[in-house]
Amino acid sequence: MLNRRHLLGLAAAGVLAKPSLSLAQGAWPNRSIRLVAQFPPGGLVDTVSRLLAPQLAAALGQSVVVENRPGAGGLIGTDMVAKAPADGYTLLVSHASVHVYAAATRQSMPFDPIADFTHMMMLVEAPNIILVRADSPFQTLDQYVTAARTRAVRFGSSGIGSAPHLLGAMLSAEARAPQLDHIPYAGSAPAMQDLLARNIESMIDPITTNVQQMRDGSLRALAVSSPQRLPAFPNVPTFAELGYPKLTSAQWLGLSAPKGLPAPIVERLNAVVPPILQRPELMQRFSDIQTLPRNPNPSGAAFVSTMREEIAAWTAVARQFNIVVT
């Protein structure tokens, strides 16, 4: 048996007070992991989360359960993760709409979008597009902005301060089209309903949920915000080639966790997730929604650096056009 003097010596050395990571946590993971989707079922975050979860579960040997925590434009679920224990059992599919665009446009946030998280890697990204109905008189972006110089042309977005809102404001200024009018909605779905009902002339939105209607011809894209034309839609020009390079952008999804995630867990996830993203069955699903991994995909410090740069750039845009979410 250990005598009192020996115990005191061990305590002074920190052996008793500070057990190692493996002793404190056991082999991670040893129970189910929750993967938080901060938007409702059916959207981009939910779709990607449910594609990733079973593959991640197989790689880690524990179940990975997608938990939808929507509300306040993604802030509720994201804030829940920020305040969760950093034990590897709560992960987040982070979204640029929260960590970049909300950070750029909101007067206050319940968390620091960088400091309160362990940001591991970008997963996929989706460009934005300008959509019109198939029977729209606007066949080109030039026709669209020319009309908006002399009469009201309405574009819908998923809400005030969203990436589509900011892109529309930039296009209006760059094209000198002052009557390009923003109509905000509580999400993309009601905006699409009004576009199809002819209540608005156009919509700016991530390509993800619009791929099928573009393919079947019910919607026409006038421009895409990707750096190059999309192989799946080679006839859709980029904003850059049409003279609007400042509109080149994308909405990314990433893998994040609460701040202070132990390094061995970070290393394990950094090892298993990138190969998962490259599996043929996932690449096909990502291609189906035109939401693909960047090449190369930034991770760790590079991912955080990308995030900081985007927050700074979009904060400047928001201030230029006085776009503030209270």
What is each residue range found by the language model?
Residues N3, G73, T140, A186-G187, ...:
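Short loop/turn segments at beta->alpha junctions
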Residues H6-A24:
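N-terminal export signals
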Residues R154-V236:
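Ligand-binding pocket segment of bilobal, Venus flytrap-like solute-binding proteins
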